Amino acid sequence: MSERKFNPAMQLLQPCIDKLVAKIDGLYLHIPFCFHKCHYCDFYSIVPSPSEAQARYEQFTARLIDELAWLMARFQATPRTIFVGGGTPTFLPGKCWENLLSAMQEQGWLTNVTELTVEANPETVTRELLDQLVAGGVNRMSMGAQSFDERHLKTLERWHDPRKVGLAVQIARQAGIANLNTDLIFAIPGQSLADVSRDLDEALALGTEHLSYYNLTYEPNTAMKQKLAMGQVTPVDEDTEAAMYELILSRMAGAGFEHYEISNWSKPGLPCGHNLMYWTNGNWVGAGPAAASHVAGYRWKNQPSLGPYLATTGQPPIIEVEHLTAEDRIGEVLMMYLRLRQGMPTTAVEKLVDARRQDKVSELTHLDLLETVGGYLRLTDKGLLVGDAVLGELL
């Protein structure tokens, strides 16, 4: 359906757009193209047929620029951080990237940007492409390694040769990328503590400035979830998963990295600014199919389908709009801030938290899952091991 026709979701969002005075802190771009769907991935992605791929890439790039023009004008957005995810952003041809970044520069959308991150898979990294990205303003890359063990990559249905990760990083450095994140996954079926330690050895040997290390989750509507239901994979048990996380904590501290969020570590002074914006309740807009936005208590999501996205112009095909109540916003702010290792200032907690949540904070503190350190409420070391469950109690 064309967005020029009646759209109930858009009608709900219109008051936000018309009256919005909030500053836009970040921009997320979703590039949906992949050459293969990994079995654990629940992000929207498509594998274009070879016969129509080039046309699809060009149509998508033009439509993304069009949507950005609409978003930037409506929200008077001057983002400080941009994150490009997918899909596989580096699967998009260099010419399309050149057109996209040139348009963003010409329109002044990059004027205030201090961090522009692009996700990359090792098998799609070339020097020519990275030269184009860096010339267009990209200054940070997130490398999707996931593991350096061929057995575990096969379990995840990742198709790259683990040796390509080092080569891709070398190319990125030569192109001028001085700020690199490495993505890893632990608690993969069949993975041992020794395997996790070896993955850490490899990641640290790359000289990475940042590490994102998430435990494998079995998301609905993924091949991995189906395999679990059919008994084709055996998940890592909770005790082993906790031991893996404790090993990661110890190894990263020993390597001089700052543990600034439950699943993220950085060299001093190099946390991911875009993700910090999420965790500190910033405002952001998203562009591309399935992209989500969060502005002044409103959340909305673009339709996760390329066809309807390409068929529209201007305002995106929005399918979900949620206006958070004051109660919901308090819960979300508390939950997001407590993902940070520093936590949330106790003065802010006292202002925000109602009696029910204060009782819950006291209970979790008594259970040694929360603590107050230096004027901040934060997760304890014990709380980190069950962070999602603890934070869920505060919603």
PLM features: residue spans?
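Flexible, acidic/Gly-rich N-terminal and inter-domain linker regions that tether
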Residues: M1-Y28, F35-H36, T61, L367
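C-terminal scaffold of the Radical SAM
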Residues: I17-G26, S45-M72, T78-V353
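Local cysteine-cluster metal-coordination motifs and their immediate loop/turn environment
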Residues: P32-S45
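An alpha-helix initiation/capping motif
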Residues: A242, D354-A355, D381-L384
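Short amphipathic alpha-helical interaction segments
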Residues: K351-H366
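A short, conserved structural fragment
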Residues: T365-G375
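Minor-groove-contacting beta-hairpin "wing" of winged helix-turn-helix DNA-binding domains
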Residues: Y376-T380
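Short, amphipathic alpha-helical interaction segments positioned at domain boundaries
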Residues: K382-L395
